[in-house]
């Protein structure tokens, strides 16, 4: 869970408004649902 948070924080720091493609990639990496990864 901590690793998920770190991954998301890093991603949003790099791209404050991630595209759908980036969110899909994050969803796969973290194992979270796409809905969870919305801003």
Swiss-Prot record:
Record-level GO BP terms: neuron differentiation
GO terms under cellular component: nucleus
Start-end of DNA-binding region: 1-39
InterPro entries linked to this entry: HD, Homeodomain-like_sf, LIM_Homeobox_TF
Principal location: nucleus
Subcellular location(s) of the protein: Nucleus
Disulfide bonds: none
One Pfam match: Homeodomain
One of the record's GO molecular function terms: DNA-binding transcription factor activity, RNA polymerase II-specific
Recorded superkingdom: Eukaryota
Keyword annotations from UniProtKB, A to Z: DNA-binding, Homeobox, Nucleus
Protein name: LIM/homeobox protein xLIM-2B
Organism lineage string: Eukaryota, Metazoa, Chordata, Craniata, Vertebrata
């Amino acid at each position: 869970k901590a690793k998920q948070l770190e991954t998301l924080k890093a991603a949003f720091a790099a791209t404050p408004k991630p595209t759908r493609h980036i969110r899909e990639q994050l969803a796969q990496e973290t194992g979270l649902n796409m809905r969870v990864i919305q801003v």
